[in-house]
Every structure is written in C-alpha cells, then in structure tokens.
Amino acid sequence: MPRTKIPKNSKRNREVANREEKVRLYELKMDSRLISIDSLETKFLSAVDHQVKTLLGQVQKELANLKMPEVLRLFEELDRFSDFKASDQTQLLASMSMSGSAIEGHAPSATGSRNDEEDSSIGASGGSILAAHTGSLLRSTKAMRTPGPLHSARARRARRSRSACGDLNILHSAKPPSISSSSSSSRNSRSKLRTPMASRAKAFSADRTPLKQKQMRSGSPTTPPMAFLRYPKPGEVALSKYGSPMVAQVMPDKFANVNIPIRNGVLSLRPKKLDADEVESNLLENLDEDTLNQIKTLHENLQMIVNKASQAVFK
Amino acid sequence: MESPVVNEVAASLGGEKLEVFRKLNLLEQHRVESYKSWPFPETASCSISKMAEAGFYWTGTKRENDTATCFVCGKTLDGWEPEDDPWKEHVKHAPQCEFAKLSCPERNLTVSQFLEILGTVVKGSIEKTCKAFKSSFVRENEKRLDEFTRNQK
C-alpha cells in the first residue's frame, strides 16, 4: 500500500521541475533581450554624438558663428548659387557623402529621392548640410521605432502618434516632480506629477545552479565523472546492496591504475611505460564502441587533471 | 508689429525642407504653431511667443489648455499665471535643462549652439523610445508568463 504513493509524488515533482525550468529559461531570454536593447540604444546614442561632432568639425567658422535667423534664411537659398568658395563647396559635398555612408539602416526610397535632389543641386550651402544631417539624425530615431519582434504593435502606435497627443509620446516627461512653494498667496506654475515605474528585480545567479547540475548529471546518470572511492581496509567486510555480504580480498594498490573492462575480463593498466608490442591486438578487438568512448572521456579527464596538477606544482 | 526679419523667417519656415525639425519642436516658429488653445493674450508675460521663446510647446487639452512642455528636457508645466516669466519658471523647475541654462532665445543662438541642442534633443528622443519599448516589452511578456503559470496549475 505505501509503495503506490511514491510514483505519484515523483511524477508531480517532475512536472514542477519542468515548469520551473521553463520559467528560468524564459527569464534568461528576457534578460538577454533587454541587454541587446540597451546595446542598440548605446549604439544609436554614440552615432548621434559622432554625427554632431562631424558636423561641428566640417562647418566653417564663419558659418558656425552665424545666428540662427541668418541660417534659416540660407535654407531658402538651397537651390541658388552659393557665395562659398569652390574648395569649400567640395569640402561640404564630401562631408555630405561621408554622412551618407555613416548612416546605418538605409532610409526608404521617398527620403532617398530627397537626398538625391540635395546632392544634385549645384553650389550646396551650409544649410543643406545642416538639413541632411538633421534628416539623418531623425531617420536614425525613426529606424529605432520599428523593432522586429513587435512590429505590428509599433505600427498601431505609429498611427496614434498622428493625433494631438503624439508629441506627448515623443517627449513625455518621466522625471520626478520638483518642489513647488505651498503658499496660496503667490501661486506658481507647478509640474505635473509623474509616477516612477517600478523596476523589475532580476533573478539571482544562485537560481541558475540547479540547471548546471542537472546538465552534468544527465551525462552520467549513475556515477559522476570524478568520485573519491575507498578500498576496504584489510579484514574489513564490504557489504553488498543486493544480497549477502561480500568479502573483499583485493588489496589496494599504492600506484595509480586504470581498469578497462573487456569482453572476457578486465584490462588493468599500470603507471609503467607501455610498449606497442605489449598491447595484443586480440585484447583490443574485444573492446566495444561504448567502452572506447568511455576511454576517450577518461583520457580527457586525466589530461585535465595533469594540466591542473602541473600548474599547482609549479606555483 | 512684427519685425521684417521675423516675417522672413516665418516665410522660409513654410518650406518643406525645415519640416524635419517640426517633429521634435526644435524651431521656435514650430513651437508657436503648436499652441492650439492658450488662455493668455499676447500682452501677458507668458504669451505664446514668450513661451515658445523659452522652449515650451503646447501639450495641453481642451480641459487643461495651459499645459506646456520643454522641447529639450521634457519638463511639463501647467497652472500658469499671466504674470509668470517663462524663462524664470523654466530655470526654477528644470535647473538641469541645457536650454534653460543657456537662457538664450533662438534669434541669438549660433549654429554651434543650435547643433549641440539638436544632439541633446535627438538623444533624449532615442532614450525615451527605448524606455517606452522596454516597458511595453516586459509588460507583454509578463502577461504571457502569468497565462502560462495559470494554465500549468
């Protein structure tokens, strides 16, 4: 009667373990996805910094010191001949092509045609450089808004951004509210209160240990690759788990050795130099494929132990 | 009476080539045009032109039409009074804002200063987009996790 309960418990525990393993894998994938999003954000931010520095470096000093109203008027003169020198025009055109090559994520054809028009215009002025770079910066921002996995969801949101609240989505404030005076006599403009979003706690690294142990155990279900075994002392009785007591008469060796089971017995290797003549082909023919694979695994394990022991001795 | 320079700037802004700035409200004229409903006249200290000069564009609604947001730092302010000075309120509530620190209207900005602000605004937009996407991504996947856990039990 009590034996019938054991299989049910083991089955239930197995299901719980499977579920927990799936949840653990899910959390690992979520963490990796969030990390990739962060790296993408960093990449775009550094691209913006690079483009701004390039633009500041390429723009001439006279143009850099101009006031904005004058520059905005220059925008209107994009189709006219510029007052800049020919060498300056060549330099500006080169910077345009450089900015074009620096952009990642190519723009759609509609925007491409606009770029072609700007490139084809003779005597491009600084205003066109500014417009091209600004367009590229904004296109970089736009490219970020269509990530692969949730493209359909983002497409729906893109439609909502056309409404009056579209600007809110772009530059909505997420900073903590500043302190405003509480006196009622002189009422000051106050900032809207924003609720900070609670950050999700990440899983501890200790939770990942059982997964590793399980992977190790799946390789050898009965015995781990390395185990400290003790030979029975002289006169000590070794009890068997499956029947009557067993008297151990084999004396432990003082030297390292390897016992390889073969079909009709056991091949025992000693730490002596082994010549090719001593290895009889008849014995090796009795080795089966599984035993050969086990020997290869043992060889790798022994090599690892030798390497680490050598390092320890040298230190 | 507007000065001829302002009229010329307004005319040039009508072209399509400057529309790339409108999305992020980088230019003062675009910020002026964003005010659909503002409860104060042009004679007030916080008129539309003065608000736009200080970096604010309209983010209000029919019910709360006195809400405005800075295009650089994203600070949103409401509860304006006719005697409020937009620049002072901006510095008071957002002292870390680069545009408020500059305290320089667009007509006195140089191209270099404008480009610095441009970079700041674009990077802010990128960070905002990433934050919104990550939060929605996590929220959707947590919903799926809850459904999975509920179905398994």
Swiss-Prot record, chain A:
InterPro entries: Borealin_C, Cell_div_borealin. Residues 103-126, 138-226 are annotated as: Disordered. Residues 153-162 have a biased composition (Basic residues). Keywords: Cell cycle, Cell division, Centromere, Chromosome, Cytoplasm, Cytoskeleton, Mitosis, Nucleus, Phosphoprotein. The modification Phosphothreonine is found at T146, T209. Its main location: nucleus. GO terms for cellular component: cell cortex; chromatin; chromosome passenger complex; chromosome, centromeric region; kinetochore; meiotic spindle midzone; nucleus; spindle midzone. The modification Phosphoserine is found at S152, S163, S205, S218, S220, S244. Pfam families: Borealin. It is found in: Nucleus; Chromosome, Centromere; Cytoplasm, Cytoskeleton, Spindle. Ubiquitously expressed in the early embryo. Expression is restricted to the ventral nerve cord and brain during later embryonic stages. Disruption phenotype: Flies show multiple mitotic defects, including multipolar spindles that result in large polyploid cells and often in delayed apoptosis. The developmental consequences of these defects include cell-autonomous and non-autonomous defects in cell-type specification and tissue architecture. Flies also display a drastic decrease in histone H3 'Ser-10' phosphorylation, suggesting that the CPC complex mediates phosphorylation of 'Ser-10' of histone H3. One of its GO terms (biological process) is protein localization to spindle microtubule. Residues 178-188 have a biased composition (Low complexity). One of its GO terms (molecular function) is DNA binding. Belongs to the borealin family. Component of the chromosomal passenger complex (CPC), a complex that acts as a key regulator of embryonic mitosis. The CPC complex has essential functions at the centromere for ensuring sister chromatid cohesion, recruitment of the CPC to kinetochores, and chromosome alignment and segregation. There is no function in meiotic histone phosphorylation or spindle formation. Component of the CPC complex. This is Borealin. The gene is borr.
